């Protein structure tokens, strides 16, 4: 499976705090931002760099910068917005693309009700953010949309993943790497990740 579980002590600590049943909206939202920031550091580890010259205090010196078009961050509405600030804290120049999905009542498959992509998608790396990778349907649909725009370098950043969701993404898009803070046990009969986080969107937006 093309999945990278970020096993950093701070990531594990903060994720456990999010799992607490009495975690407040403020605390949950803050931790989601902090985790996204830490995890984005790992997800950006293989960014390609190039050399260029700058004027330093002692004269001209050679330095490094990220090569190519700026990353586009792609939150899946609405829960993905809860991770956006954390990624932007680390990569403030990132461009933001947005995808909104809903379930077709006949096919039960996710369909797009809103999508807004930045320009030159075929030249940019994309980082999809969503707290939960459960069945994988929304993630697969989002990757489909990105590839239809010509995007070739795609990663997914999620707080918690279920094996079922990871398998769905890997089966449909084996070239996409998933970064997660935890690979949990399974989905229950209602499609919730166990032990998971509950409804991350409701907890982030205070609508639970």
UniProtKB/Swiss-Prot annotation:
Protein residues bound to uracil: 193, 198-200
Keywords, alphabetical: Allosteric enzyme, Glycosyltransferase, GTP-binding, Magnesium, Nucleotide-binding, Transferase
A GO BP entry: UMP salvage
InterPro entries named in the record: PRibTrfase_dom (IPR000836), PRTase-like (IPR029057), Upp_B (IPR034332), UPRTase/APRTase (IPR050054), Ura_phspho_trans (IPR005765)
Activity regulation, per record: Allosterically activated by GTP.
Positions with a binding annotation for 5-phospho-alpha-D-ribose 1-diphosphate: 78, 103, 130-138, 199
ATP-binding among keywords: no
Enzyme Commission code: 2.4.2.9
Any one of the GO CC terms: cytoplasm
Pathway as given in its UniProt record: Pyrimidine metabolism; UMP biosynthesis via salvage pathway; UMP from uracil: step 1/1
Similarity comment text for this entry: Belongs to the UPRTase family.
HAMAP family per the UniProt record, alphabetical: Upp_B (MF_01218_B)
The name this protein goes by in its record: Uracil phosphoribosyltransferase
Species of origin: Neisseria meningitidis serogroup B (strain ATCC BAA-335 / MC58)
